Design a protein with these regions (language model features):
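Bacterial Sec-dependent N-terminal signal peptides
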Residues: 1-27
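Periplasmic alpha-helical coiled-coil/stalk elements that build and connect Gram-negative outer-membrane
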Residues: 5, 27, 163-167, 171-293, ...
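Acidic, low-complexity, intrinsically disordered peripheral segments
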Residues: 22-23, 69-71, 76-81, 268, ...
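Amphipathic alpha-helical coiled-coil scaffold segments and their short linker/junction regions
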Residues: 33-37, 89-93, 227, 231-232, ...
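A glycine-/polar-enriched beta->alpha junction
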Residues: 34-44, 51-68, 105-138, 146-163, ...
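Amphipathic alpha-helical coiled-coil segments
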Residues: 45-60, 179, 183-204, 215, ...
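Transmembrane beta-strands of outer-membrane beta-barrel pores
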Residues: 74-78, 125-129, 152, 332-336, ...
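Residues that define the transmembrane beta-barrel architecture of outer-membrane proteins
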Residues: 98-104, 140-144, 348-352
Length: 496
């Protein structure tokens, strides 16, 4: 490889590195939330959680449909010693016997949810060949058999599945939207953390430039004895502190930018510039409406309903199992046996089966009764927990909506305070330059401006955090008055 090639490779690598390091994007709040829901690792995790629940429900629905099964045993060889009667010696003797067999069958089954029984249709064919002293070949067929098996007094799982499984899937869908709004809430938090860091950094830069200018002015005024030595040292201290603040703000900015880039699954070298949202439109949310939406949409309510149903199912199961159990199996069909395959299906004979089995617990030392009492007590616990969760959620919705409605007024107040603080600082700075304001007044004015800037960004952050938290708790978009479920495509897991 010649030097030109080496130089070219190095140049390309440096170009790629510089291009990567200087990659920059500009994001507003809406775009940040979209990227979070499309690209973040949290969004991928929640999407796969939804798909897991989706396929679980599909499996439940498939189990309600007829199933067709083929059972095959292509070959079985069996060699053994058996006892046989020898007519020549009039005594039993042991003989070696060999057997080869094969079987196949088709079975159609359909569960019947109302009674918990199972309908079935079978068709079987078996082949048997014996070797040894006794040689024979037989085909046994069951061309057709239809039957029904049913637990007469037992637990019916199908009936409870019809109540629980659709509720579970509805909960999974609502959880998906809930977690999507949770990702949006996280995105808002990361966005404003970076916004606060950028504002701090910008203020630190301006403060650094301002303190440097003021210190230079102070030096000139000190030479003509316009300010004291103590005031000059204070200006110098402000300059040093401003430089330290700038360095700390730069570190905090890098951390906040890296955190947002990582959350959005971007390259860690991405430079992010934020477009801050302005004052949001005035919107008042009714606490009663938010509570009603939460009770009908929040997945935590559905989860508590699921827990209550599952506990009631366990009570029913243990109560039924504490008594005797009886089951019925009835079938009618045809069968035949012959030495060859064709005759095995010729003139089949009718085959009938009716069986009733009963299982009666006599002595179990209170095991069944104990299980039933445990299930009943657990049902009471679940109902109490469901009520506690309901009260907790009602409190959370009420407080969040109240904070949101107040936060809109706080944004207007914080914006007004920021404008006043900026004007006050500029006037104090000009008065200091012409010698009509002291250092303490200037420092106090600067601190007030910085505090007002932080309060304004914090007010915006709290507003949007509360807004998306309300969306998460209610699964409702109050801005467009639409349910978030109506805007969701559950097949693809994406907003429409």
């Amino acid at each position: 490889m010649n030097w030109k090639s080496v130089t070219l490779c190095i140049g390309l690598c440096l170009f790629a590195f510089i291009g990567k390091a200087q990659h920059a994007v500009k994001l507003n709040l809406k775009r940040t939330i979209q990227l979070a829901n499309d690209s973040s690792l949290s969004a991928f995790r929640y999407q796969n959680m939804y798909l897991s629940g989706y396929w679980e429900y599909r499996t439940y629905k498939a189990n309600r449909l007829p199933s067709l099964t083929m059972n095959l045993m292509p070959a079985q060889y069996y060699r053994y010693i058996t006892q046989r009667y020898d007519s020549n010696t009039d005594m039993d003797v042991y003989r070696e016997q060999q057997m080869f067999s094969a079987s196949s069958g088709l079975s159609i089954r359909q569960n019947f949810d109302l009674t918990g029984g199972t309908f079935y249709i079978d068709s079987d064919l078996e082949y048997l060949r014996n070797f040894g002293d006794t040689r024979s070949t037989q085909f046994s067929s069951v061309p057709f058999r239809i039957g029904y098996s049913q637990s007469l007094l037992g637990y019916n799982p199908f009936r409870w599945d019809r109540k629980i499984e659709p509720l579970k899937f509805e909960k999974v869908k609502k959880e998906f939207i809930y977690h999507t709004e949770e990702v949006s809430e996280e995105a808002v938090n990361y966005f404003f953390n970076l916004a606060m860091a950028q504002a701090d950094y910008q203020l630190a830069k301006e403060n650094m430039a301002s303190t440097d200018t003021l210190y230079s002015i102070g030096l000139q005024r000190h030479k003509i004895a316009a300010i004291s030595r103590a005031d000059l040292l204070t200006l110098q201290l402000d300059k040093v502190n401003a430089r330290n603040t700038l360095e700390n703000a730069q570190i905090a900015l890098k951390r906040a930018m890296f955190a947002l880039a990582s959350f959005l699954n971007m390259d860690k070298h991405t430079q992010i510039e934020l477009d801050m949202p302005g004052r949001p439109l005035a919107m008042e949310i009714s606490v009663d409406e938010a509570l009603a939406r939460a009770k009908s949409n929040n997945p935590n309510f559905l989860q508590q309903q699921q827990h209550v149903l599952e506990a009631e199912r366990d009570v029913n199961k243990t109560r039924v199992e504490s008594r005797f159990n009886a089951s019925l199996n009835a079938s009618v069909g045809f069968n035949q046996v012959a030495d060859n395959f064709k005759d095995a299906y010729r003139k089949p004979m009718q085959q009938d089966l009716v069986s009733v089995s009963v299982s009666i617990p006599l002595v179990d030392w209170g095991v069944r009764k104990g299980k039933h009492n445990m299930a009943r007590n657990n049902l009471n616990v679940v109902k109490i927990a469901a009520r506690q969760e309901e009260l907790k959620l009602e409190e959370e919705v009420t407080m969040t909506v109240s904070d949101f409605n107040i936060q809109q007024r706080l944004i207007a107040s914080a914006e007004e305070a920021l404008d006043l603080a900026i004007m006050a600082y500029e006037q104090t700075r000009q008065r200091f330059i012409i010698g009509k304001a002291d250092v303490n007044s200037l420092t106090l004015s600067l601190n007030r401006q910085q505090e007002a800037q932080k309060n304004y960004i914090s007010a915006l952050q709290n507003y949007w955090l509360n807004y998306y938290k309300i969306r998460k708790l209610t699964l409702h978009d109050f801005e467009s008055s639409l349910s978030l479920s109506d805007r969701f495509d559950f097949n693809n897991g994406m907003y429409r």
